[in-house]
């Protein structure tokens, strides 16, 4: 289980190092290719010209 967590963490850090294209079906909302991909259960909010994921509509 710990190994899985480490792999997932490494993948997240790797993905954060470069702009994402939201190619997975359950990801969306990478406005201007400057923000991060959001899970479908989250909302996208634009802050400082970047797309960020938020659990609610306002953050």
Swiss-Prot record:
GO CC terms of this entry: extracellular region
Q: In which tissues is it expressed?
A: Expressed by the venom secretory cell of the spine. The spine is a cuticular structure containing a single large nucleated venom-secreting cell at its base. It is an independent unit capable of producing, storing and injecting venom. On the back of D.vulnerans caterpillars, spines are grouped together by 50 to 100 to form scoli, of which there are eight in D.vulnerans.
The cysteines joined by S-S bonds are 22-38, 29-44, 37-53
Q: Name one GO molecular function term.
A: toxin activity
Segment forming the signal sequence: 1-17
Q: Sorted alphabetically, which keywords does the UniProt record give?
A: Disulfide bond, Knottin, Secreted, Signal, Toxin
Main location (coarse class): secreted
Query: Where would you find this protein in the cell?
Result: Secreted
User: Regarding domains, what does the record say?
Assistant: The presence of a 'disulfide through disulfide knot' structurally defines this protein as a knottin.
* Similarity comment: family membership: Belongs to the limacoditoxin-3 family.
Q: What does this gene product do?
A: Probable toxin. Does not induce increase in intracellular calcium in mouse DRG neurons, suggesting that it does not induce pain.
What name appears for this protein in its UniProt entry?
U-limacoditoxin(3)-Dv32a
Lineage here is: Eukaryota, Metazoa, Ecdysozoa, Arthropoda, Hexapoda
